[in-house]
Amino acid sequence: MLIDGIHVPLTVPFARDGRCYLRKLENNVGRYSLSPVAGLVAMGPGGEAGTLSDSEIADVLRVIGQAAAAEKVLVAGIAKDSVRGALAVAELAAAAGFDAVLLSAPTSWPELSKDRAQLSLFFSAVADASPLPVMLWSDRTAPAMQLSMELVAELAAHPNVIGMYDADLTVERYRAIADATRDVKREVKVTAVFAPVTRRMEAAAREDGTFVSAESLGGGAAVAITAKPAVKTRTKVVGFQIMAAGPCADMLPLLEAGVAGALPRLAACAPQGCYEVFAAFKDGDPALSANKAERVREADGLMQELGVAGVKYGCDLNGYYGGLPRPPRLPLTAVQRSRVEAVLGEVRN
């Protein structure tokens, strides 16, 4: 699976009574699907995945899988601390049409951060049995943890571990990871223009076949339905796929170093603004990319500061449904809302 470009960390909308607002989630995903972002990440670390029940997780994954455009890469975050629980979510994600899962270290046992053998066992056991490829999550802030270079290099050799999102990525750390995983080479299926081929694209191609109508079985004329043209695919060789998961405004140096793309928090409420930073670089105009990055820097920093409550209010301002965070997280104060309104005024959504 090709992982690159801008990925959006989806929020989970809640109604005022605290239930998942699935219709609003469906609308949000449909709108993100009209944007030029490459992928959507559900229930990622740092969001509210840990507040969801098992049935809510199943509902959220199902709605996203049904609402997303087929060409958008779908990645499901796993907020479970056991191998069994993680695999249950991976199975749900596969059934919903997702393309990969995002796996972070267990958060219930801080002592694991000092025990590489147990960490390796957790990640490897999930990767062994997961029906979907695994992306690793690394973040030095609680409750997650930054994965050591040695552990990343070990896990990258696993055939079902295809890359990582790194919230602390610097040019130096990226180069160290790239060097440690330089022997990893895999073929992925892409379109004629080297865009990802998702599982839902392949499923649609299998379903679009020529068939004979039921009426023709009664002796009438057969009616053949011509299949849609199949998606033309080719293969591309990729290494261990590394995505930045920090501020959008700091993306350019990482892209210049070779990072495949990014998962910026700001993309949830301003996907177009984040994409323009990436697109300008891909178009060979780093000066324009730097200019675009400066335009979003203040909004970017504020989203990092205010967290999910700030992102959700930003979504409300920019045409998505954010709503309130789920308790015990608090909504923004009036002063904080004014700050978000001020910085998002010039950021394209």
Predicted regions and their residues:
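Catalytic alpha/beta core domains of metabolic enzymes, predominantly
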Residues: 125-128, 140-295, 300, 304
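Generic alpha-helical structural context detector
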Residues: 8, 279, 312-316
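C-terminal extensions of enzymes
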Residues: 309-349
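A general structural signal for well-ordered alpha-helical segments in protein cores
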Residues: 57, 61, 86, 174, ...
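Active-site beta->alpha loop and helix N-cap motifs at the rims of alpha/beta catalytic domains
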Residues: 1-146
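Structural signal for hydrophobic packing residues in well-ordered secondary-structure cores
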Residues: 14, 33, 68, 72, ...
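A non-catalytic, amphipathic alpha-helix used as a structural packing/dimerization or gating element
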Residues: 24-27, 31, 59, 63, ...
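Conserved, mostly hydrophobic/aromatic
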Residues: 18, 32, 64, 93, ...
